[in-house]
Amino acid sequence: MARKALWAKSFLKEPKFKTRKHARCPLCGRPRGYLRQFDMCRICFRERALRGEIPGVKKASW
């Protein structure tokens, strides 16, 4: 299945059992690397953090 079809299928249809539900990024539809705290995948999180769109988040440096 195409990525858009999987995304639409996961957002529109509720699974029969709660354990079957898999979190997806609402911005790009990516099923892996999902950060619950920010409700997006790691790639979208990184892009927005570097642009300064997520308050209180900055790139680590040590």
UniProtKB/Swiss-Prot annotation:
Give the protein name, as stated in the record.
Answer: Small ribosomal subunit protein uS14
Gene name on record? Answer: rpsZ
Q: Does the keyword Disulfide bond apply?
A: no
Q: Which cofactor does it need?
A: Zn(2+)
Q: What does this protein do?
A: Binds 16S rRNA, required for the assembly of 30S particles and may also be responsible for determining the conformation of the 16S rRNA at the A site.
Q: Give the InterPro entries listed for this entry.
A: Ribosomal_uS14, Ribosomal_uS14_bact, Ribosomal_uS14_CS, Ribosomal_uS14_sf
GO molecular function annotations of the record: rRNA binding; structural constituent of ribosome; zinc ion binding
Instruction: Give GO cellular component annotations, separated by semicolons.
Output: cytoplasm; small ribosomal subunit
Q: Where does Zn(2+) bind?
A: C25, C28, C41, C44
Q: How is the cofactor bound?
A: Binds 1 zinc ion per subunit.
Keywords of this entry: Metal-binding, Ribonucleoprotein, Ribosomal protein, RNA-binding, rRNA-binding, Zinc
Q: Which GO terms describe its biological process?
A: translation
